[in-house]
Amino acid sequence: MRLETLPSEFQEALPVLEKIKAAGFEAYFVGGSVRDALLQRPIHDVDIASSSYPEETKRIFDRTVDVGIEHGTVLVLENNREYEVTTFRTEDVYVDYRRPSKVSFVRSLEEDLKRRDFTINALALDENGQVIDLFQGLDDLENQILRAVGTAAERFNEDALRIMRGFRFQAALDFDLEQDTFAAMKDCAPLLEKISVERIFIEFDKLLLAPFWRKGLEALLTSGAIEFLPDLKGSRAKLERLFDLASDFRFSASEQAWAALLLALDVQNVKGFLKKWKTSREFAKKAEDLVEIAAIRSERDLTKRDCYDYDIDLLLQAEELRQAQGLPVDFSAIQNLDASLTIHNKQEMVVNGGMLMQEFGFEPGPKLGQILKELEHAIVDGCLPNDLEAVYAYIEEKK
């Protein structure tokens, strides 16, 4: 198969291929960018594989960065863009179900492609638009099939994260897993416990944010792989509650997706759960806030104080989840409440602790903090203008 017109992303990278070939080596576009070009999907990173060894690649180009040279990858800076050029390679025995014990550089494209995960990702593209397909990846693309390259069990034993990638690709592409590939994913699922939580989180997160997340999640659940993810043993029945969300619903942000997961699981200790997933504190706070907002909305309408206490984006995300559940929503009420706030944080108050100490002789300590909190709430609730004279008069009256 040949692409008559190369997508612009490849055309911009052609000078890199041409320089490598002019130096006497082979070079091809490889991986996800080729797959996405053939599917007419947006292309993100353009990766290049070459028969040139890293030191040879560095001699070809004026500006390079050693980003993963031990694995054969050199970052080439060309035409104000960055391209990863990786030497054709083979990999020895995997010591931890994630990293090969040894990487060997080779001059053969076939040897390089046969180590890849799925046939649709084992395609190469030359400078003329000719697709090199050694594992029937084009047929699988046409038939919307996810099939492991070679023996599926070997691929997943080499790198167990490929199991999560398989579910993620399902969610992204709406493809079906080939029977033997799915069977190997089920058999190798216990190996997921050997993979770093951070890497699993990235794949699971991408799955949840993908357009066909239901398909990927269903495969993750039915395969039993969910049993080997942090704190999710025995969670299948509860996670199936996510399928009750509106059929056309897509999560708008990671924190929203994970809040929905937390709510489906009825997690009581959100911080503890997300700590096991090793998320950032900022992310955990957003997810926890969303769970709290959902609890508030299940009991009453939101108030000005709620709009002050929680980020407007999170309030709207929580409302989106309610809408997906078929519950009553009022987006305009939230926006109106937010717009009516006199202040959105305590830094916007006309007074601070230092001013009160100077004006009224307050000492640092709990009492001063209590007064500031009372002022903050009075201003937010609309009981007190955010005006210096009014605030001072309010304090005088309370003294």
UniProtKB/Swiss-Prot annotation:
Enzyme's top EC category: transferase
Function (record text): Catalyzes the addition and repair of the essential 3'-terminal CCA sequence in tRNAs without using a nucleic acid template. Adds these three nucleotides in the order of C, C, and A to the tRNA nucleotide-73, using CTP and ATP as substrates and producing inorganic pyrophosphate. tRNA 3'-terminal CCA addition is required both for tRNA processing and repair. Also involved in tRNA surveillance by mediating tandem CCA addition to generate a CCACCA at the 3' terminus of unstable tRNAs. While stable tRNAs receive only 3'-terminal CCA, unstable tRNAs are marked with CCACCA and rapidly degraded.
Binding-site residues, CTP: G32, R35, R116, D159, R162, R165, R168
One annotated GO biological process: RNA repair
Cofactor: Mg(2+)
This protein's UniProt keywords: ATP-binding, Magnesium, Metal-binding, Nucleotide-binding, Nucleotidyltransferase, RNA repair, RNA-binding, Transferase, tRNA processing
GO MF terms, alphabetically ordered: ATP binding; CCA tRNA nucleotidyltransferase activity; magnesium ion binding; tRNA binding
Pfam families membership: PolyA_pol, PolyA_pol_RNAbd, tRNA_NucTran2_2
Binding positions (ATP): G32, R35, R116, D159, R162, R165, R168
EC code(s) of this entry: 2.7.7.72
CDD domains attached to this UniProt entry: NT_ClassII-CCAase
Organism of origin: Streptococcus sanguinis (strain SK36)
InterPro entries associated with the record: Bact_CCA-adding_enz_type3_sf (IPR050264), CCA-adding_enz_C (IPR032810), CCA-adding_enz_firmicutes (IPR023068), NT_sf (IPR043519), PolA_pol_head_dom (IPR002646), PolyA_RNA-bd (IPR032828)
Protein name as catalogued: CCA-adding enzyme
Catalysed transformations (reactions): a tRNA precursor + 2 CTP + ATP = a tRNA with a 3' CCA end + 3 diphosphate; a tRNA with a 3' CCA end + 2 CTP + ATP = a tRNA with a 3' CCACCA end + 3 diphosphate
Gene for this chain: cca
Note: A single active site specifically recognizes both ATP and CTP and is responsible for their addition.
Binding-site positions, Mg(2+): D45, D47
Similarity comment: Belongs to the tRNA nucleotidyltransferase/poly(A) polymerase family. Bacterial CCA-adding enzyme type 3 subfamily.
Quaternary structure note: Homodimer.
